[in-house]
Amino acid sequence: MSKNPGRILIFDTTLRDGEQSPGASLNLEEKLAIAHQLARLGVDVIEAGFPFASPGDFKAVNKIASAVGKEHGPTICGLARASKGDIKACYEAVSPAPKKRIHTFIATSDIHLKHKLKKSRKDVLQIVPEMVNYAKSLVDDIEFSCEDASRSDPDFLYEVIQLAISAGATTINIPDTVGFTTPSEFGNLIADINKNVPNIDEAVISVHGHNDLGLAVANFLEAVKNGARQLECTINGIGERAGNASLEELVMALHVRKSFFNSFFKRNPDSPTPLTAIRTEEITKTSRLVSNLTGMTVQPNKAIVGANAFAHESGIHQDGVLKNRLTYEIIDAKTVGLSDNKISLGKLSGRSAVRARLEEMGYDLSREDLNDAFARFKDLADRKREITDRDLEAIVSEQVQLPEAKFQLSLVQVSCGNASKPTATISLLNTEDNTEDTAVSIGTGPVDAVCEALNKLAKVPNELIEFSVKSVTEGIDALGEVTIRIRRDNKIYSGHSADTDVVVAAANAYINALNRLVFSEKKNSIHPQFDNLENSNNTYISNPAN
């Protein structure tokens, strides 16, 4: 049996695999905000990024390691291909964290070896112990992944795992890289690894999976039954293609069905001891933060965190819930932090009252950020009678998105109606040369006119592929949240903003998307799965953060 920590370790890869979702690129401040919230959530490991990808990625991982990595906090992990250049960069990036991990990987399936790496099985058997041993010389906590494990030859997989553990790997990750396997197959694979790898008891078995067939969470739960003790997942299940296993779904499945899973940990079915260290009341806030910052809207019927997750339309269901919530609800909404709390703050409220409420909600803002958030609060309070926690979340999320902005909106003015052509006047500040220009455009509607004017000013060719708007809270004076997605060179960039005026929100969301596009093209990152290992052996960005 593999090394057993006595519970499930939650390894969050939102900032690495999650950010690889189309349009989900994040700047440094956004990554840092998410990392702080993941620490409050109680994840065991934060995979902060792929340090070798670019100087920006290195800096982000390094900053998270120093700011979020604490002695009693999460382990900070970086991803590295099985090459010295990657591993060295990873080590330097995570080095400020008291608890640090290097996560190195290489493919083990024949299809990946032949068509991607151009390597033989013999090559892999030589690379794995050499690179794991090198990583071990730098840090004690080493995770090794067999990429595309679910499509690998089992006997070869066992051999690779045994070599990795002998070389010093403390965690062995079994990825279902393309979301190919089924629950029974994945459970059997974990069971067979436990049976056929002689030194497996020296490492924790981890699983990583994608949701291409909608089976990622089910696969993981079956893996838990067969000995997996670390689950690699993302907030809202974001990730490449159809996404990753969803953290909130996994955690709440283990929470709600604890009596069922307890037996697989040799516990009494009625044992009250939690199966994870997650503070479930932080789930909803974490979900909303990630959604706001990535611009990836959560589908309404998404389990646990969707807008309809605790809604009842049927009269029979409504009647039952009113009599006893347990008739149709298996989770108390408060367990995941869902609350309709309203705060009695208005335009006469002071900074200390706003700060106190933000601290109660888990936000720890610097003096400068608090001043900016308070200014936004006062502006909103002039236009909205009641301020809710959701409004404050929107204000803070909006503030986090401001850094690394080439373009800033100075003015938006729109004229429209059923007897006139929608016309927008936009003034845009270019922060790089501190110049401001104004443009006027006509569109099919007010938002189209705004986007046309912004494109004239920004001169960044793109295609608008999605526009969506929803209210943050109830009422005619509610904040409107706008999400915009644009495309350039087959890459997607998202922007998000909230305002009581949805046209202003749309303008800011579009500018956010443009800023992400510009930032991403400057960043010029490489992808961990699509570059040859040879590219990283001799090219290393030493201290790119300086």
From Swiss-Prot:
<feature type="binding site">
    <location>
        <position position="244"/>
    </location>
    <ligand>
        <name>Mn(2+)</name>
    </ligand>
</feature>
<dbReference type="InterPro" id="IPR050073">
    <property type="entry name" value="2-IPM_HCS-like"/>
</dbReference>
<dbReference type="GO" id="GO:0009098">
    <property type="term" value="P:L-leucine biosynthetic process"/>
</dbReference>
<keyword id="KW-0464">Manganese</keyword>
<keyword id="KW-0963">Cytoplasm</keyword>
<dbReference type="InterPro" id="IPR036230">
    <property type="entry name" value="LeuA_allosteric_dom_sf"/>
</dbReference>
<dbReference type="GO" id="GO:0030145">
    <property type="term" value="F:manganese ion binding"/>
</dbReference>
<keyword id="KW-0808">Transferase</keyword>
<dbReference type="InterPro" id="IPR054691">
    <property type="entry name" value="LeuA/HCS_post-cat"/>
</dbReference>
<dbReference type="InterPro" id="IPR000891">
    <property type="entry name" value="PYR_CT"/>
</dbReference>
<dbReference type="InterPro" id="IPR013709">
    <property type="entry name" value="2-isopropylmalate_synth_dimer"/>
</dbReference>
<keyword id="KW-0479">Metal-binding</keyword>
<dbReference type="Pfam" id="PF00682">
    <property type="entry name" value="HMGL-like"/>
</dbReference>
<dbReference type="InterPro" id="IPR013785">
    <property type="entry name" value="Aldolase_TIM"/>
</dbReference>
<dbReference type="Pfam" id="PF22617">
    <property type="entry name" value="HCS_D2"/>
</dbReference>
<dbReference type="GO" id="GO:0005737">
    <property type="term" value="C:cytoplasm"/>
</dbReference>
<feature type="region of interest" description="Regulatory domain">
    <location>
        <begin position="408"/>
        <end position="546"/>
    </location>
</feature>
<dbReference type="InterPro" id="IPR005671">
    <property type="entry name" value="LeuA_bact_synth"/>
</dbReference>
<feature type="binding site">
    <location>
        <position position="208"/>
    </location>
    <ligand>
        <name>Mn(2+)</name>
    </ligand>
</feature>
<dbReference type="Pfam" id="PF08502">
    <property type="entry name" value="LeuA_dimer"/>
</dbReference>
<comment type="function">
    <text>Catalyzes the condensation of the acetyl group of acetyl-CoA with 3-methyl-2-oxobutanoate (2-ketoisovalerate) to form 3-carboxy-3-hydroxy-4-methylpentanoate (2-isopropylmalate).</text>
</comment>
<comment type="subunit">
    <text>Homodimer.</text>
</comment>
<comment type="similarity">
    <text>Belongs to the alpha-IPM synthase/homocitrate synthase family. LeuA type 1 subfamily.</text>
</comment>
<keyword id="KW-0028">Amino-acid biosynthesis</keyword>
<dbReference type="GO" id="GO:0003852">
    <property type="term" value="F:2-isopropylmalate synthase activity"/>
</dbReference>
<feature type="binding site">
    <location>
        <position position="17"/>
    </location>
    <ligand>
        <name>Mn(2+)</name>
    </ligand>
</feature>
<comment type="pathway">
    <text>Amino-acid biosynthesis; L-leucine biosynthesis; L-leucine from 3-methyl-2-oxobutanoate: step 1/4.</text>
</comment>
<feature type="domain" description="Pyruvate carboxyltransferase">
    <location>
        <begin position="8"/>
        <end position="271"/>
    </location>
</feature>
<keyword id="KW-0100">Branched-chain amino acid biosynthesis</keyword>
<dbReference type="GO" id="GO:0003985">
    <property type="term" value="F:acetyl-CoA C-acetyltransferase activity"/>
</dbReference>
<protein>
    <recommendedName>
        <fullName>2-isopropylmalate synthase</fullName>
        <ecNumber>2.3.3.13</ecNumber>
    </recommendedName>
</protein>
<feature type="binding site">
    <location>
        <position position="210"/>
    </location>
    <ligand>
        <name>Mn(2+)</name>
    </ligand>
</feature>
<keyword id="KW-0432">Leucine biosynthesis</keyword>
<dbReference type="InterPro" id="IPR002034">
    <property type="entry name" value="AIPM/Hcit_synth_CS"/>
</dbReference>
